[in-house]
Amino acid sequence: MMATSGIANRVKTWLISTWHVKVPDPWLEACINWIQEENGSSLLQAEINKQVFEQWLLTDLRDLEFPVLPANITDSLKCELNGFHAVQMDSLVDISLPAYSQLQKLKGKDSTNEQVTCTTQQSQKPWEAKPTRMLMLQLTDGTQHIQAMEYRPIQALNANLSPGTKMVLQGTIVCRLGVLLLKPENVKVLGGEVEALVAEYTQTKVLSRLIGVEDNTVAQHSNVQEHAAGVAAGELGQALGPSDEDLLASLEENEEFSINNGVPSESGYYSRNENSSISSSTQHQTQDSIVRCWVDDDILEFSINNGVPSESGYYSRNENSSISSSTQHQTQDSIVRQTSFPMLDQTVVHVNVANNHAIEEQFDIDDELFLEEEIQRELEEMSMSQAEVTHGSTDLPTTLSATSHASSASCTSDQNNIDIPPYTYLSTILASKSRSITCVKLKSFIVTLNGNLSHSCGLWNIKAKISDGTGYLNVEFSDDVLTELIGFTVPEMKTLKKDPSQQSTLMEGLQKCQRMLTDFCGVMTVSYNPAKEEAVVLSLQDVTEEIMQSLQKLLRS
């Protein structure tokens, strides 16, 4: 019998001593018989050893049904795996990056907008380590399936490894909750692939399954397929073991996206852009330039024209400054500045800093997609607290001590018909048949900026779209609100531009304004003209304890 023959015993001993590979006797017998039939019985022992190993590399270990991992290892909360265990990798995925962005990159549809998330993206400090790749592997010994995580960077692993690749787990490996925590010394890649798995576990299909999307693309073959089965071919004929250098796949650094840290906000959406060289057709935005891309060129031309050194290497995106008509500010001169409004309600919002077509092409963000998630969250909060009722207030915020005749006159008509304490809702305003100018309070947030921060006739100006969960409204922020946020007026800004030592003061003011607008979710006092469909934000106010008490009284009444 072949099981007791000297050839089979020598092959089995060689596999275990050289590669730590264990195979069942029936498979080994059948493999040796097939090799001898194909090549004759005059093969040398070394040639038989080599061909048996190559056949094992191409075999699905499920067909062998030969266990090598400890029984029930996945059921233990914590254990250690010791010794040598030859296993098969069915698939792997990089869990350090969003699956959707990886999928889009594989399909050639990569976009910086795919990196925008609905969670807080903290700015990375210069001294902080860059995020590293973390692969999650699906392994099997033919009878048990187990996950393994790249606990430390492992050069032998990369995303191009073919499904069905064989590897040896060696040394002491900690296993927690059925997941092996792999370190570089724990993994030795042997190579190989399984043809049936190559089509089933392509990166495109694996990522598509993770996000619940059907993948209809043609199966992709790994870039390292040419050496999958021939890893040992160049080395087996030389000596006892293969060279690790020939078995290691080249490690490619994952492309990192720099997070705009110009706004160290605790909430809000951030766009992460791939770094690119500056040219006449492409614009370069680095970490501290998020403030600059929503400000007109003439406001920041001081720092550019005077060659002030900048860590960001910023260059302006916009070709033309946006000049606003002075008629848009007729209600602004009369508003007394609001002294402060600390951020009490930290709501995640998204600011799209698009002004012209060039920016819109680069930041082609679907506002409705983000808004749908934000509105859904707002509505859930309102339904849970039962405190967000569709009523409003007749009073301006207490932080505004007085108003002039112009703004007062614009906020008196039909006010009592729709404005009930402590604030009203956009759906109520938009549904009203009144055509008179109305001054109302809205608990709202900014959905998107409809232009850049600009100035005209000595007044600050920026337009935006706001929402409270029941509707949308295009508004313009008054000069007094923007001046309070920025910290200086337009004439004062022009003075600061002339002094190179004041550049930091100028930038800090703009950063503060953007941060406040990004984070704000509170009560806005808005003058709304339904006839012209125009609205001006007159003041901003946080949700105070007094407002909450008013809501509770309404609920009890």
From Swiss-Prot:
The source's superkingdom equals Eukaryota
What segments bear the compositional bias annotation Low complexity?
Answer: 398-413
Keyword annotations of the record = DNA replication, Nucleus
- Name one molecular function that GO assigns to this entry: nucleotide binding
Q: Which N-terminal stretch is annotated as signal sequence? A: none
Q: Which Gene3D superfamilies match?
A: 6.10.140.770, RecQ-mediated genome instability protein 1, N-terminal domain, RecQ-mediated genome instability protein Rmi1, C-terminal domain
| Compositionally biased intervals (Polar residues) | 259-275, 310-320, 383-397
Q: Tell me where in or outside the cell this protein is found.
A: Nucleus
- Has UniProt tagged this entry with the keyword Nucleus? yes
Asked if the record carries the keyword Cell membrane, the reply is no
Instruction: Name its GO BP terms in alphabetical order.
Output: DNA replication; double-strand break repair via homologous recombination; resolution of meiotic recombination intermediates
The principal localisation class reads nucleus
Any Gene Ontology CC annotation? nuclear body
Q: Name one Pfam family in it.
A: RMI1_C
Q: Where is this region: Disordered?
A: 259-284, 310-329, 382-413
Q: What's this protein's function?
A: Essential component of the RMI complex, a complex that plays an important role in the processing of homologous recombination intermediates to limit DNA crossover formation in cells. Promotes TOP3A binding to double Holliday junctions (DHJ) and hence stimulates TOP3A-mediated dissolution. Required for BLM phosphorylation during mitosis. Within the BLM complex, required for BLM and TOP3A stability.
Q: Cite the record's note on assembly.
A: Component of the RMI complex, containing at least TOP3A, RMI1 and RMI2.
Per the record, the similarity remark reads: Belongs to the RMI1 family.
Looking up PANTHER family in the UniProt record yields: RECQ-MEDIATED GENOME INSTABILITY PROTEIN 1, RECQ-MEDIATED GENOME INSTABILITY PROTEIN 1 RMI1
Name the record gives this protein: RecQ-mediated genome instability protein 1
This chain's source organism reads: Xenopus laevis
Q: What is the lineage of its organism?
A: Eukaryota, Metazoa, Chordata, Craniata, Vertebrata
